[in-house]
A protein has these predicted regions:
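C-terminal accessory segments
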Residues: 168-229
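Ser/Thr- (and often Asn-) enriched beta-sheet segments in non-cytosolic proteins
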Residues: 2, 8-10, 34-36, 235, ...
Length: 259
């Protein structure tokens, strides 16, 4: 995995690129894990494998009792493009194992699959989201991107494979990025992702409008790499140093204004 976590972790405004060598982008392992993954891009965990693979080509894996909130991310290109060999639990944007849990809101997922023949519901392989655990999935865009297929075979690509999860209010459509071919993932003016994310005000965009689905939605991240556009406090002066209970105290701050 590019990031392996066994404790609490918050990931904001990051990019995890698989460099076309399979593997897993973010691996959340164990009941001590309480993770928040937001405003990030996880992509290109892919292979052209002739042999058997097991739990490969996965954007985010939540396992062994871990829990995660996955909000306003882009997850794509998690796939095995050659149908030779057996692919087990592989080719997933998000994979949640039994006993683990996740809230998945406001994300755009596409191009996660395996090129093989489907072997039945007890061994699902190739899906944007696969959950054997407790998952709440809402207000995402699940895009059936047209995959490239090497060496023939049948492409296994579905939006969601679920056992104990609930999926609601998601959009099955092209998200209409500004220029996907040049990695400009801002939203075009007619994108169905605009104002279509989770409606709870805690997820609102920085301008106060409803959450936009995708990595630029919400108010926790500013695209130039900062996490706030408000003044930043650099120091505090308190006088007097000691006062009786209920006595007055003056606090002066020094800081900087973000430009």
């Amino acid at each position: 995995a590019r990031l392996y976590a066994q404790n609490q972790v918050t990931i904001t405004g990051c990019e995890f690129e698989g460099n076309n060598d399979g593997g897993i982008g973010i691996d959340l392992d164990g009941s001590s894990v309480k993770a928040l993954i937001q405003n990030s891009r996880i992509h290109s965990y892919k292979l052209d494998s002739l042999g058997d693979i097991n739990q490969e080509c996965i954007g985010i894996r939540v396992r062994n009792g871990a829990s995660a909130r996955i909000v306003n991310n882009l997850i794509h290109g998690c796939k095995d493009r050659i149908h030779n060999g057996n692919e087990t639990n592989s080719g997933f944007g998000i994979f949640i194992t039994s006993g683990s849990s996740a809230f998945i809101h406001g994300n755009i997922l596409w191009d996660c699959y395996v090129s093989r023949y489907y072997t039945g519901p007890e061994n699902p392989t190739g899906a944007l989201i696969c959950s054997f655990g407790q998952a709440t999935i809402s207000h995402n865009i699940l895009w059936q991107f047209t995959p490239d297929i090497y060496e023939g075979g049948h492409t296994r690509e579905v939006q969601i494979t679920l056992k104990e999860a609930q999926a609601t209010h998601s959009i099955l459509a092209d998200p209409k990025f500004t220029d996907i071919n040049n990695s400009d993932f801002t939203l075009a003016s007619d994108s169905p992702a605009i104002n279509a994310g989770p409606p709870d005000p805690q997820y609102n965009d920085r301008d106060g409008s409803r959450n936009d689905i995708g990595m630029f939605g919400g108010h926790n991240f500013i695209p130039d790499g900062r996490t706030t556009n408000k003044p930043i406090v650099l120091g505090l002066d308190v006088a007097p140093i000691a006062v009786p209970t209920g006595g007055p105290v003056t606090i002066e701050s020094t800081g900087a204004t973000v430009k």
